[in-house]
Structure formats: C-alpha cells, structure tokens
Amino acid sequence: MRRAERAVTDREKILRILDACHCCRVGFSDPDGAYIVPLSFAFVPGTPDRFYFHGAKEGRKAALIAARPKVGFELDCSYALVEGTSGCSYSCRYQSVIGTGRIGEVTDMEEKKQALAAIMAHYEPEKSFAFTDEQAQRVAVFRLDVAELTCKERS
C-alpha cells in the first residue's frame, strides 16, 4: 500500500467498514481481458474470511468462476467530496477494502441456504430469512475464500 498512513489494521474497524459497504466488485481475468461484476454480498469472518454471493447458474460470471477461480475484489463506502480552491486541490474521503482470493460454487444445500440468509441479513439486519431447498436450488451461490485483504481510509 503506497499510503501506509491510511491503512486500517484494526480488525473490528475493518469489520465495521465491510458492514457499511453495499456492493462488492469481483474482478476476473480471461483471454478477452478484465471482467468486473458488482455483487450483493455477505461477509463471514473466520479462517479463512469468506464472502458469499448469489447469481445465475449460467453466463460469463459462472463460467469464469468455474474456469479461473483466482479473483480480486473491491468494496468502498463513506465517499465524500473534499472541495479545494482549484481542480487539482480537490480530493475525497473514503473507506475501501481490496483483496484477492479463490471463488467457487457452493454445492452443499445447508451452506447455500445459510449463505442466502447471510446475504439478506447484511441488507436487512432487523429481519430473519429462511430459505427452502427448492428456493436455494434455483440460484447459484458462490463462496470467495479470502487470501489477502487490505483496508484503507481517508477521513
């Protein structure tokens, strides 16, 4: 990280920042170039830390996950413009998380249902959600096992 003074290393603060984010962008690479997908997500801390996503069972994203599971990811929040006296002196406040990991499809039905409930809980923390096998079978659920994660902020 070039600006080490902006690094966030406190685990609890990183978890709060992740909780404040609404979108996780996952980046893939294939022979045609880079491909970035914005996704709804759940973050589950552990060893390893994990992100869960859901989506279609077919398409470019699903094909890339099967063929090239090494990915990068990015989340950001708390963006605010900092005005300056000239265009070159403008800046912004932000919090961001970036990292790398391996992504794959979840096939265990119980893990799929728990992942879907965790995704919903991220966006509706005051509600409880349960999914049937039939509902979970209709979508693909993907798990990203985090290999590296860094967090940065400018406040």
Regions found by a protein language model. Give the residues of each.
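Extreme N-terminal tail/first-helix region
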Residues: 1-19
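Charged, gly/pro-rich active-site loop segments
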Residues: 2-5, 78-155
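Short Pro/Gly-enriched beta-strand edge/turn motifs at strand-loop
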Residues: 8-10, 20-25, 125-127
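A generic structural signal for nonpolar/aromatic side chains embedded in well-ordered alpha-helices
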Residues: 18, 64-65, 119
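Short beta-strand segments
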Residues: 21-57
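Short, structured patches in soluble enzyme cores that scaffold and shape functional sites
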Residues: 28-30, 55, 75-77, 146-148
